[in-house]
Structures are given as structure tokens and as C-alpha cells.
């Protein structure tokens, strides 16, 4: 898993191209300054302090950088090492790898997700993509005589590559080793778009560091950037002598290389920040730890995959019944009829337009079939002429050495289908002509009629209710006035008060007829009653 999966996918799916053989690279050193970490498991659960193996003096080591900015060189030339193309050039900037005036080598392409700012690495990648596209166009665009259907190339294209299968198998093996459930039925999925690689720190109990690999080629610089780090604790960290940090809560152990330049065995990487390195030269300013790199795979069980792919049905919530009834009545009385009328007119117009479109489709099919019939007639005439010209050599097919092709006229099926379409169009046109917008509205009358009675009652009540109310009020007022007029004389007679007895009118039964009194003086009940003086009475 040292090689990112979409790097070898790019190499596999795109055919390779050939370049002229460049001169060998001159980026060799007589003695390797790099050393390898070597761990030995002494007892389970404990890892001894790392030991280092330096290459013997005189062993040539090739050193190349994975990234070279555009402002580090004026010009670059191609060179070759171990059947691989590299760029070489002289550094013009002291801050560049190697220093000012030093000739260094770097990879032909930039690493995944990186750019050199429009330098030779980016230009080489663009050139490679253009050549591959032109090659694919040339291979698949050349027309060849028809010799039957050949799906062999399609099968080769669709076949999963061996290295991709190996990647899946390695992932599954690792899953079985680290998973306690040991899943047997699962789905391993790769993303179609680019996603960052996943960094998994080297676990505390790990016993596979004893693999020794001779380092004859060293790649300095980041191999992958923008990593996704899964864990930030229990890390095995690397500390160089020029670094200032000594403790970190995320690290459970520290290892200090004896030199500033060190490499890791294949399959293990230094992760510094969000970039992965195979070799470090001690110039990293951030904390580095040991990690594995895995592609951004997603593992699903059968149940998880089904729940992820197949969407669950959405259950409708049951609204409150009074709210439904109230909303239905208000909608029917307020805006129901207008909405139904608008929808009916809209669908009627849509049906007419659809009918016209179907008619045009039928006409297009008839026109296309006529063109095919005329083309077939021309081809048959040409075929007969070629058969006459090549009759001495056995006819056209024998002359070309190909299979004979015959034309089967199936225009009758197309004509029959067009006739059925036109019959349906005619029926729909008659239905629309007989129905009309008000005919479509009649289909909604069974739904509207139950609301017409309450609606008419409410309208009549609003129209005639005020008049009836005014009549009732006037009638009651007139009766009250009549009763008041009848009761007023009686009330006045009961409220008269006389000053003297002689002031009272004579009773019909009285025998005194010659007594003349003064007219009675009416005194209102509100005035005080005057009593006669005892001295003045006679």
C-alpha cells in the first residue's frame, strides 16, 4: 500500500508513451548519508529502541526530490535512472534543495495533489495527458471494415486491474487482522472523485519492523499531501537534534535518529503536518510521527449498504382532525372554486399542447421512415450495380472477403405504430373538443355540491340578515311606544296632590251642590306638601 491507488490507476488506465533515451542521471553519492530504521521485537507488547543500518561505504545511492518549485532553476533536462525518467538541473536559489549551484534530480511528474507552479513537472503531466488522449482518439477513431461484433477490447477495458484487486485483498486482510468481528460479507468501496488519503498511526504493539530493504534510491520530499489523520494520540514520534520540542501529550514514545537524514522501510511513512514522507533530512519544523497510509476506502456491511443505497420510505404524519376539517371548509369556501377553475384551465391547455406535440412526433417519424426507405432503395441499386461489376470475381462479398449483409425492410412496423399514435391523437382531440373547460369542471361538481348549500345559506344571511334585523327592531320599538302612550294618563292622575279639601272635585254622590270652590291647584309630587295653619283655620 505504499503506492497510492489512483497513481497506479492513472498509470494503468492510460497507455504508456515512449521517450527518447536521455543520458543517465548524475545525482549519485559514493556513500549513502541515509539510514534505515530497524525494529526488533524482543518480547510481545514491548518494542526495543530502534537500531539503524547504514549502507556500506562505496555503495552508490541515487537521490531525487519529489517536488521542485519553478523558481529553483533556470532550465531542466531529462535524465534516466533505473528505467525511470527524472529531471535534473542546477539550483539558483539558496533556499532550494541542495543549495545554490548544486545539481539535483527530481521526479518527472509532481506527486498527487501537488504542483510546481507551472514548471517542467506540470508541463510534463499536461503533455502526457494530451498524448494519451490523442492516442486513444487515434486508436478508437480509425474506421475499419465491419467484420462482426468484437467485444474483446471492451472486456479488457472493463476488467479490474490486477493491482487494484491486490489492493482490495490487502485491505480485506488488514481488516480481518484488526477487526474483532472478522467480517466475511462486506463491501469495500472506492470513491470516484479525489479524496485525501487516510493516515493510520503505527500501533503500540507492532512486530513487523524487521524487514530489511537495501536502499539504493531515495526520494526526498512529500509523497502525499492533504492527509486525513484518524488518530492524534498514542503516536510514535520522531525527534531530531535541532528541534526544540521535547514533550507532547499525543506521543507515547520518542525516537531520535543518530543523523539528520533517515528513511523508513517500505509501507511506513513519516507524517509531518498533513504530508507523508519516506525519508526525512531533519529540516521538518513540525512534529513527525510514524504512520501507515491507506486509500480512502469505505467498508460497508450488507445492512449498511442497503440502508445507504435504498432510501427508506417516508411516513406521512397524521394531522389533527379539527385542523383538517377547518382547513378543508375554509379552503372550499374561500379559494377552492377559484383554484379548481385555474387548474382545470391549465390542464386543458396542457392537454392541447401535448396533443399537438404528439402529432408533430408522428409526422417526424413518417418523414424519417421515408428517408430511410429512399436511402435503402439507393443502397440496393448500388449493390446490384456492384454485383454486376464484380460478377466475374464472385460478387461484391467474395471480392471484399467479408460477410454479406442484407437489408431487412421493417418499415411496416413503423408505419403501423405511427397509425396507432395518430388514432390516439384523434381520439384525444375529439375528447378535448367535446369536453371543453366547463366539461372538465363538471367532473369536480360532486366535490363542490356539498359545499354549495352552506355557502348559499351564508350568502343569504349576509344579504337579508340586516334588513330582517331592522324590521324586528322597528316593530318592537313601535309596540313599546304604544304601550307608553296608553299608560301616560293613568300615571298623571295618580300623581296629582290637592292643597285643601275643598279643592278636591266633588264626587257624584255628594249632596253639597252650592259650594263653590276655587279651581284646584295642581302641585307636582316633587314640591313639599303645605300643612294649614292652626291659627288661620275657621
Swiss-Prot record:
Disulfide bonds join 186-189, 186-405, 397-404. Residues 320-340 are annotated as: Fusion peptide. Expressed at higher level in placental syncytiotrophoblast. Expressed at intermediate level in testis. Seems also to be found at low level in adrenal tissue, bone marrow, breast, colon, kidney, ovary, prostate, skin, spleen, thymus, thyroid, brain and trachea. Both mRNA and protein levels are significantly increased in the brain of individuals with multiple sclerosis, particularly in astrocytes and microglia. Residues 496-538 are annotated as: Disordered. The chain crosses the membrane at residues 444-464. Keywords: Cell membrane, Cleavage on pair of basic residues, Disulfide bond, ERV, Glycoprotein, Membrane, Signal, Transmembrane, Transmembrane helix, Transposable element, Viral envelope protein, Virion. GO terms for biological process: anatomical structure morphogenesis; myoblast fusion; syncytium formation; syncytium formation by plasma membrane fusion. CDD domains: HTLV-1-like_HR1-HR2 (cd09851). Belongs to the gamma type-C retroviral envelope protein family. HERV class-I W env subfamily. The mature envelope protein (Env) consists of a trimer of SU-TM heterodimers attached probably by a labile interchain disulfide bond. Interacts with the C-type lectin CD209/DC-SIGN. This is Syncytin-1.
Amino acid at each position: 500500500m505504499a503506492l497510492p491507488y489512483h497513481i497506479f490507476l492513472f498509470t494503468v488506465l492510460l497507455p504508456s508513451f515512449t521517450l527518447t533515451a536521455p543520458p543517465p542521471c548524475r545525482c549519485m553519492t559514493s556513500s549513502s548519508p541515509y539510514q534505515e530504521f530497524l525494529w526488533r521485537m524482543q518480547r510481545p507488547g514491548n518494542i526495543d529502541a530502534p537500531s539503524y543500518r547504514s549502507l556500506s561505504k562505496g555503495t552508490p545511492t541515487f537521490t531525487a526530490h519529489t517536488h521542485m518549485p519553478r523558481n529553483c532553476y533556470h532550465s531542466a533536462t531529462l535524465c534516466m535512472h533505473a528505467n525511470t525518467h527524472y529531471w535534473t538541473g542546477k539550483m539558483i536559489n539558496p533556499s532550494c534543495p541542495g543549495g545554490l549551484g548544486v545539481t539535483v534530480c527530481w521526479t518527472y511528474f509532481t506527486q498527487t495533489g501537488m504542483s510546481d507552479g507551472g514548471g517542467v513537472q506540470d508541463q510534463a503531466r499536461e503533455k502526457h495527458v494530451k498524448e494519451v488522449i490523442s492516442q486513444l482518439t487515434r486508436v478508437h477513431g480509425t474506421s475499419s471494415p465491419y467484420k462482426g461484433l468484437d467485444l474483446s477490447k471492451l472486456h479488457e477495458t472493463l476488467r479490474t486491474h490486477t493491482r487494484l484487486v491486490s489492493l482490495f485483498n490487502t485491505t480485506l486482510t488488514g481488516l480481518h487482522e484488526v477487526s474483532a468481528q472478522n467480517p466475511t460479507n462486506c463491501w469495500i468501496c472506492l470513491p470516484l472523485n479525489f479524496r485525501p488519503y487516510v493516515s493510520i498511526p503505527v500501533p503500540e504493539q507492532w512486530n513487523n519492523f524487521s524487514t530489511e530493504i537495501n536502499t539504493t534510491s531515495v526520494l526526498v520530499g512529500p509523497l502525499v499531501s492533504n492527509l486525513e489523520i484518524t488518530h492524534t494520540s498514542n503516536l510514535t514520534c520522531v525527534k531530531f537534534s535541532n528541534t526544540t520540542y521535547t514533550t507532547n501529550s499525543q506521543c507515547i514514545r520518542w525516537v531520535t535518529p543518530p543523523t539528520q537524514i533517515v528513511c523508513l522501510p517500505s509501507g511506513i511513512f513519516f507524517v509531518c503536518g498533513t504530508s507523508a514522507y519516506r525519508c526525512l533530512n531533519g529540516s521538518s519544523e513540525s512534529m513527525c510521527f510514524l504512520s501507515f497510509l491507506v486509500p480512502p476506502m469505505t467498508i460497508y456491511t450488507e445492512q449498511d449498504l442497503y440502508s445507504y443505497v435504498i432510501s427508506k420510505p417516508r411516513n406521512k404524519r397524521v394531522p389533527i382532525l379539527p385542523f383538517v376539517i377547518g382547513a378543508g371548509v375554509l379552503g372550499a369556501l374561500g379559494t377552492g372554486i377559484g383554484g379548481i377553475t385555474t387548474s382545470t384551465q391549465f390542464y386543458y391547455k396542457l392537454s392541447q399542447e401535448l396533443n399537438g406535440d404528439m402529432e408533430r412526433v408522428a409526422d417526424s417519424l413518417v418523414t424519417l421512415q421515408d428517408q430511410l426507405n429512399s436511402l435503402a432503395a439507393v443502397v440496393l441499386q448500388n449493390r446490384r450495380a456492384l454485383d454486376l461489376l464484380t460478377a466475374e470475381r464472385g460478387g461484391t462479398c467474395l471480392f471484399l472477403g467479408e460477410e454479406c449483409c442484407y437489408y431487412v425492410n421493417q418499415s411496416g412496423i413503423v408505419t403501423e405504430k405511427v397509425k396507432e399514435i395518430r388514432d390516439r391523437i384523434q381520439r384525444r382531440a375529439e375528447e378535448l373538443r367535446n369536453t371543453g373547460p366547463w366539461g372538465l369542471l363538471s367532473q369536480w361538481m360532486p366535490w363542490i355540491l356539498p359545499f354549495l348549500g352552506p355557502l348559499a345559506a351564508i350568502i343569504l344571511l349576509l344579504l337579508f340578515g340586516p334588513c330582517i334585523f331592522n324590521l324586528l327592531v322597528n316593530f318592537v320599538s313601535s309596540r313599546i311606544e304604544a304601550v307608553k302612550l296608553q299608560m301616560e294618563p293613568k300615571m298623571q292622575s295618580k300623581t296629582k296632590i290637592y292643597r285643601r279639601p275643598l279643592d278636591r272635585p266633588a264626587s257624584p254622590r255628594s249632596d253639597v251642590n252650592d259650594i263653590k270652590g276655587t279651581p284646584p291647584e295642581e302641585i307636582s309630587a316633587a314640591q313639599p306638601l303645605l300643612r294649614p295653619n292652626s291659627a288661620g283655620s275657621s
